[in-house]
């Protein structure tokens, strides 16, 4: 049995809430700025090319190349699927990837791997699963406003965790895509998870309860980690 990835997100219900809240906001600011500099990715999704596949094979080997081919086929075959069908396929695709920590994979405390790096090493931590599912669903035509990458507290493990939430409509109860579960369940049925923050490419929310969040900011004020965008674009062989 493995431990959750325990991203550097504190539990805001702790007695040290002021310190932990500041730490949580710093973590989210870093991650959000990383993702937001790749803003076109949120709008257009992942790009596949022969150059990308060749790079994957050189960097990670032929098996990794084939995994990216399978991801491309997954995206391209999704046109006729309902959104629940897309969720099921994407959740199953990435949940078969092995779990490991950032320290073990990248020798770093916090490393935000691209979907291609995830498939390259065939391993991920919880942030990587959630982000990879997010990008893939965007590629399939799911609107960004329906998706939120969500930091939660896992009560079973007493650790921080990350999942992807899908909102069928603005006021609907979200569905939770979790690397620890094959089932996609309504948030109200996940009593083992306490949401803390959620975000997408545009906004940031503070959790009010398991089903609702209060918007606490937008993303255009964030301006760090341009390297993530450059890395992702380079991997996809997209001209800057």
Where are these regions (language model features)?
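N-terminal secretory signal peptides that target proteins for export/translocation
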Residues: 1-17
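Structural motif marking the loop-to-transmembrane transition
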Residues: 16-24, 83
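A structural boundary/capping signal
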Residues: 2-4, 39-240
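Bacterial N-terminal signal peptides
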Residues: 23-36
């Amino acid at each position: 049995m493995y431990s959750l990835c325990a991203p550097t997100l504190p539990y805001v219900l702790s007695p040290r809430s002021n310190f932990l809240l500041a730490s949580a906001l710093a973590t989210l600011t870093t991650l959000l700025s990383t993702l937001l500099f790749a803003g076109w990715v949120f709008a257009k999704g992942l790009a596949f090319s022969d150059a990308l596949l060749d790079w994957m094979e050189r960097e990670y080997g032929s098996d990794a190349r084939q995994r990216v081919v399978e991801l491309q086929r997954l995206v391209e075959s999704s046109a006729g699927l309902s959104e629940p069908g897309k969720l099921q396929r994407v959740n199953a695709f990435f949940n078969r990837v092995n779990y490991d920590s950032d320290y073990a994979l990248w020798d770093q405390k916090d490393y935000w791997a691209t979907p291609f790096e995830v498939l390259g090493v065939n391993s991920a931590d919880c942030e990587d699963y959630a982000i990879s599912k997010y990008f893939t669903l965007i590629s399939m035509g799911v609107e960004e406003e329906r998706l939120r990458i969500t930091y939660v507290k896992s009560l079973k493990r007493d650790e921080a965790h990350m999942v992807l939430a899908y909102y069928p409509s603005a006021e609907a109860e979200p569905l939770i895509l979790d690397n620890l579960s094959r089932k996609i369940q309504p948030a109200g049925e996940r009593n083992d998870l306490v949401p803390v923050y959620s975000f997408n490419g545009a906004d940031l929310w503070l959790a009010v309860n398991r089903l609702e969040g209060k918007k606490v900011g937008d993303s255009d004020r964030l301006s760090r980690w341009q390297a993530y965008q450059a890395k992702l674009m380079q991997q996809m062989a997209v001209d800057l």
